[in-house]
Amino acid sequence: MKIGQVFRYPRDKNRKKKMIDGYDNFSYYTNCPNNKLVLLESGINPIQKVKNKDGVISPAILTSSSPHKIGSSDTPWQDFYNTSKGHIRYSGDNKDVGDPLRKKGNKILVQQFEIHNSNNYEIRKMASPIIFFKRVAANGALKGYVEFNGFGVITNAEMKVEHNRKSKVD
């Protein structure tokens, strides 16, 4: 995968087709034989865990940002992707009112933050890389395409409150 490369991410997944609608097929390029499909159905998507000599890990955690929704009543926050400087600020997963740390995806990222930043090498080597995608428009469609924006480790985590115009709650 190359930074900026756009993949077709259709509703009906197909691991065998290399190209769909003139774009590289996400499911073909992320195919892990004998494992579940690699999906981007929510904001935070861990790949199915596998066992290696050191234990059980998720090979990677994929995040998905939807810039076309920035500032909407549903998503008042904004993710920042500055791939030329190697910096991404991802806002997590919490559209609903409630404790954001109870959300599965946020909980996974907080756990990974602790692993990525551990002083203990044995713990750190169990870290899952974070892989970043943005949903983009292509072929006249707003959905069904994702752009690879790189991978990284978590260096900072903070709790941030945004006003939800839809529910009128902070």
Question: What are these regions, as identified by a protein language model?
Answer:
Residues M1-D24:
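Second RecA-like catalytic domain
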Residues K17-Y145:
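Acidic, glycine-rich low-complexity segments with interspersed aromatic residues
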Residues N139-D170:
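Compact mixed alphabeta submodule
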